[in-house]
Amino acid sequence: MEFEIITSGLRFPEGPVVMADGSIIVVEIEKKCITRCWGDGKTEVIATPGGGPNGLAIGPDGALWVCNNGGFIYTDMDGLLIPGNCPDDYDGGRIERVDLSTGKVDRVLDTVGGHPLKGPNDLVFDKAGNLYFTDHGKTYSRHRDFGGLFFLANGASEAKELDFHYSSPNGVGLAPDEQTVFMADTMTGRMWAFDLESPGIIKPASPFNGGRVVATMPGLQYFDSLAMTAAGNVCVATILNGGITTITPGGDFHHTAFPDLIVTNIAFGGDDMQDAYVTLSSTGQLAKCRWPEPGLKLNFNA
């Protein structure tokens, strides 16, 4: 696929959000900041949450909502920036809210049901302004946390756990009819789907899991963040087999390659929603290309 690099020199970019003014907002996880990219090489730091800002989304209040994973230890390996274990200065995971006019960062929540969030990763709002988000957990020298899928009702102060005990929950998205939540699990290379009875209420797929498996990748491939298409396909960033894997609701999949081992996310924009912005994280680049199908327009934009 043909693409252009519109921004370089970023420190592990993730979470692209396409703004109405044509700019793209990303996080720089290693730099612990949120950056606006103008597409001509110009960048501007708009907020400094610290920790590890990760997934981003515009909320119903017009603010920028942030999954903050608390940070990683990074290694520079042959010119590639590689994230790893939980850092010594880790002070917990949290959901944050950024006022785009001032850059002020507020903590929305850091516990669910009395349990601390470990590494919130990605988030999506439904049309009513309810929030679904994942907790990826943290990795340590000899073990790692389990993670799960969570729900925060619009206007609520406390979230609830929808399902837990997943290896490494990452990207999350809603089907166009908002009857299904899709969740990528990193270490298993598996795409899960959670059917909803109503917002925040899942129909358990089995006595063992709330979700059902849509697809599992062959060989060693890791899933990262994702975006939905208007047709209901899942475009999930894929690590090691660097690129974007498109998965149909029925489980068929195909791969679009990009030149980075750690491709972490994709976002759609443009009048026809076929401009795709892809974060090439280990090389610190933001790429732009034309996608073969329109992306799903998000419920809230700014």
Where are the regions a protein language model picked out?
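Sequence-structural signature of mature extracellular/luminal beta-sheet repeat domains
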Residues: 1-302
